[in-house]
Amino acid sequence: MRFSGKIAVVTGAASGIGRATALRFAEEGATVLAADIDAVAGQELADRSNGRIRFQRTDVTREEEIVALLGKAEALGGPDILFNNAGAGGLRAKIDEIDGDGWNRTMDLLLKSVALGIRHAAPLMARKGGGAIVNTASVAALAAGAAPTAYSVAKAGVLHLTKLAAADLAKSNIRVNAVLPGFIMTNIFSSAVGLEGAAKAQADALIRGVGQQAQPIRRPGRPEDIAAAVAFLASDDASFITGTHILVDGGLSVGPRHSWDPDTPGLFEALASLAPAA
């Protein structure tokens, strides 16, 4: 198995892409240290893994918790792999509507946490002779209008950070790459606007419809689609690949795009309209 004897750290592991990737690493032989702010879902993942996955509640916006997480990975004999994946929809405002606090929260979660994960994992990996880091960016890093402003800017930052870190860390035999998901069936959209129950089901149907219209491959992606790309980039099969990214978007970035009419809401606004009135 590709990851036998490896210690893989996965943030945002309690659901969606992170959960699928933690399971993929475990299935291929790794010992996985799963991190998430959701302690209930994270521990449930670990409890069902036959000991292959261990969970540590982690708020990646707090540097000391990132340090503690990687310290636990070191105690296990790692880290060999770091998947910086924790995230959420973030501030939904347009550029002329943003506020400083919301902007900072989005950057802390989506960009600063990735930088700090790399910063604190790199010395540990270097002492082991190398490692692999994969960061979750987004197709929104490449085009305006694909997602809210702050989210898109943060993900563009992750993409450039990936390149800079790859150049800096190659001397330590540490590879750094990114995955750029397109429309993936996770809770990130509905959670961003606080949807539950019937409204969440409606939101899932809306996202599925957008995915079918927006991409040459006429379906939204699955978390497992991203996990497969992450596993490849983290493996020795990608030993000569660093400083780049893989688009996992069903052709969204190259094919005919779904575009909202300027007089109708964007995706997040459409989802927000499903939420019950306060």
Where are these regions (language model features)?
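Short C-terminal tail/terminal secondary-structure segment
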Residues: 92, 231, 242-278
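Substrate-binding pocket helix/loop in short-chain dehydrogenase/reductase
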Residues: 93-95, 99-104, 211
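Residue(s) in the substrate-gating loop at a strand-loop-helix junction
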Residues: 138
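Short, flexible catalytic-loop segment of classical short-chain dehydrogenase/reductase
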Residues: 180-195, 254
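C-terminal substrate-recognition "lid" of short-chain dehydrogenase/reductases
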Residues: 2, 118, 219-248, 253
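Alpha-helical segment proximal to the catalytic Tyr-Lys
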Residues: 123, 167-171, 239
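Active-site helix of classical SDR
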Residues: 118, 154, 162
